[in-house]
Amino acid sequence: MAAPCGSELPANSPLKIPKMEVLSPASPGDLSDGNPSLSDPSTPRGASPLGPGSAAGSGAAASGGLGLGLGGRGAASSSVSFSPGGGSGGAAAAAAAACRGMSWTPAETNALIAVWGNERLVEARYQQLEGAGTVFGSKAPGPAMYERVSRALAELGYERTPSQCRERIKTLRRCYSRVKEHGVGKRKSSYTFEQLEQVFGQGGWDAQPCQPVLINSSGLYQELESDGSTMEDYSQEDWGNHSQELHGYPTDQELDEMPVSKRTLKIKQESSEEAQKRDTMQNIVQILESVQLKWELFQSWTDFSRLHLSNKLAIFGIGYNTRWKEDIRYHYAEISSQVPLGKRLREYFNSEKPEGRIIMTRVQKMNWKNVYYKFLEITISEARCLELHMEIDWIPIAHSKPTGGNVVQYLLPGGIPKSPGLYAIGYEECIERPLSPDVERHALDPGKEGRVDLETLSAQASLQVEVEPTRIIYCYLGIAEVRTLQQCLFLHFQANAKTFSKEWVGINGFLSQNCIVDPGVSPKSIYIKFVEVERDFLSAGSLVECLEKAIGYPLKFNN
């Protein structure tokens, strides 16, 4: 959890004078939170809220209606400054302020919301039922809960007593309920409805838990104008505008000021990431379909308890059908290579998790009829093999200039691990295809012989074939179990005249033959990739078949 930026303010920061707020020394510790105004943060633990001049301050307030200003956060004792109050109701205002307690700043309120959400998740784990996921009980949080919240706030630099935290939570819950039921408020707030929805949603303590939105280190909410207002005093129209402002959505003016190149780059990055995720999921679906697994209907957690999935790695898919179409379609697919399958499936079939909430909502709204799952158990070495294919980039192998006539030497890159693992060798394939119809039509049309333009002539002369984007073809999967990755790759790429042959015999023969080139002709571009795997795991699983299923074609030099 990031510490709020307000905790870094110097002790001599400018003083702010709250409006009509006077604190009485009679109640410095247990202060309620009925005051909705937003002003300076509280004093450090162990120091009097009034500082050295508390007695004078209370006497002056009782006689002349004086206001009190507190010093900057983090000081050992708060400095006190007095300013003339206005009117004859000073004593009444002082008494009312003492009852209400010290007000909460925007940063404090947001930190409290975040801490409260975290503590509710901890409480949920204490109440977890065997084999049933996270379930909240109906018992309201007790004093211990507010003690933990108070300590957590202290770690962030905000000194609040448990009773103050309890009163503030009550106020926030009332604010949330009012906006939830009526959809309207009166004035602005430093927190959004979405934040409160995440920690108070659907009935308060019985709500579904969700990680709260934390304030960022730049003080997103700290810079809001402290106008003494809360969410209760907030109109529906202003609420939407304020929520958009808090979440940082760009306005039309900001979009106009943003350079077009930056906007285009951001869109391209997002679209590239989405395309990569889509391609990865399609690859996983292809693997699941290639092994012809049967869909299983999800009914209860009893099914999973029989399967003993707590310590298994697997490739799994989540599917669904509808009342109109019985065919089962994929909703999601994943390789659970780091987290046990049982834990991942719980997240997708537990309505209190973000993934599970999506599925539950679609079933409740009758978008889906039934939910299904399928999985293929894999070994650790097979999981690393799939990681090698889907997450590790190819490394090109350079070659020297021809020596001794028409022979080139491979130049392996540095940094190849001296440890066991898996490695793959591939080569770049160029696919040629006939000329496009337009070029063929211009070339074969006799009626246009006298008026062929320069573009057509250039196409006929230099583009006899159109080359598609190249792709790298896997041809060999190696297991560095007895030797290290570095030793295995060096053995493959050592150019030896004795191994030269016109017929390719294994991967070494292929690499040796590729070193012999005709004058003016470059050898095939060769690539490698590798991943470290513990030696004890390398002997488990069917690694070659695993990779062949993932890439969709056989490895040429492994058979």
Swiss-Prot record:
It comes from the Eukaryota. Residues 46-61 have a biased composition (Low complexity). InterPro entries: MSANTD2, Myb_DNA-bind_4. This is Myb/SANT-like DNA-binding domain-containing protein 2. There is a cross-link at residues 268, 343 (Glycyl lysine isopeptide (Lys-Gly) (interchain with G-Cter in SUMO2)). The gene is Msantd2. The lineage of its organism: Eukaryota, Metazoa, Chordata, Craniata, Vertebrata. The keyword Ubl conjugation applies. Residues 103-173 form the Myb-like domain. Keywords: Isopeptide bond, Phosphoprotein, Ubl conjugation. Residues 1-62 are annotated as: Disordered. Pfam families: Myb_DNA-bind_4 (PF13837). The modification Phosphoserine is found at residues 13, 24, 27, 32, 48, 436. PANTHER family: MYB/SANT-LIKE DNA-BINDING DOMAIN-CONTAINING PROTEIN 2, MYB_SANT-LIKE DNA-BINDING DOMAIN-CONTAINING PROTEIN 2.
